[in-house]
Amino acid sequence: MTRLRDEFPVLATCVYLNSNSTGAFPRDAARVLAEYGERLTRWRDETWEDWLAALRRYHAGVERLLGAPAGTVMTDASASALLGRFASCFDYRSGRPRVVTTNREFPSTGFLLRAMARYGLELEVVDVERDDLAPEAAIAAALDERTAFVVVSHASFATGALLDLRALARAAHDVGALLVVDAYQSLGVVPLDVIADDVDVVLGGAHKWLCGSTELAFMYVRRALLSTLEPAFTGWMATDAPLSFAPRSAYAGDAWRFACGTPQVLPALVSQRGLDLLLGVGVAAIRAHSLACTARIVARCGAEGIAIATPPEPDRRGGIVALRFPGSQQVQQRLLAAGHVTSWRGVLRIAPHIYNTFEEIDACLDRLIAERRAAV
C-alpha cells in the first residue's frame, strides 16, 4: 500500500476520497508532459506513428480491463462524443425508432438523445426509483421490438447504485435490441467483463477511477457488431490507414471506425500510468478493498442515524457511499476546508479507492459526524 500511495502526490496533501469525481493523478505524469513538450520542440511528422501506437497501447489496456478482444475499443475526448457517434449509426425512421434510458443517467445521455428526435429517434425515460419494481424489471418492461438500443449506467453517478447487466442484456437481446452501458462510474473499481456480462457497447473515461486525465473517454463495441455500424458523425481518422491521407473508401475494420478528427494524444499518454497501476493491482483486489471501505462507511453512518442513499447490499453498491442529511453541502465544504476531499451532487459522496486506508476513512467520518452534530 505504501509503495502504491507514493505514486499519487495528492495523498500527501489531504485525505482524498473523491475518486468518483476525479481520481488521484500519478506523479509520472510530469515526466510524460515534459517528454510531450520536448517532442513538440523538435517536431517531425513521423511522431504521429509513435502517437497512434501509444493510443493503441491505451486501447489495449482498456480491452484488458474489460476482458475484451483486441481492436474493440476506441478513444475520444468525451463519452458524449462517442455515444453520439454510436447513435449516428442508426436509421430511426425504419422499424426501430425507440431508444430507452432511465432517470438515473448522467445528464449528457438525455441531452444527446433528446436532440436526436429530429432524426426520428423516439426516447423513453424509465423511472427506476419506483418502490414497486426493481430497476431491471422496470427497464425490461419498457423494451419492445421497436427498440434499437437501451442506455443505462452500470453505477449511478449520484449514489453508486449498481444495475445487473446480465439481466438487462438478456432483456434487450430478447427483443433484438442492443445494451449500451455507461460505465464511467464503475470501471476501475467494479469488475465488468463484456463477454460474461454479454453487453454490446461500453462507455467510460480515464479521469475518475482509472486515475487518468480529463479529455479521454473510450468506447467498447462488440466485435460482431463492428461491421454493421457506420457512423454518420465521422472524420479522417476513421480508416485503417489514416496517415495515408487518401480519400476514404471504407471505414476501419475495427473500433477505429469510431474515430473522428485529430485524436486525443496527450490525455492518453498521461493516462497510461494510472491504468497500468490499476491493472497491476487487479480489479478483483480493488473491488474487495472498496467493499471493505464502503461497508465501514455504511456501518458508521447508519449507526449515527445518517440516511444512506447508496444500496446497503454489497452486490448493489458501487464505489460510492452517498449520504443525505440537512446541511450536507455545507458539511462537505467544511470537510474540504479541513483537508478531507469528498464531493456533493445533491448528496454528500464519499469514494475511497485502492490507495485509501481505513485510518483515512475513520478520520473523515470523525470529522463529518462532528460537523453534522454541530449543524443540528
Residue ranges and their predicted role:
Residues 1-376:
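Pyridoxal 5′-phosphate
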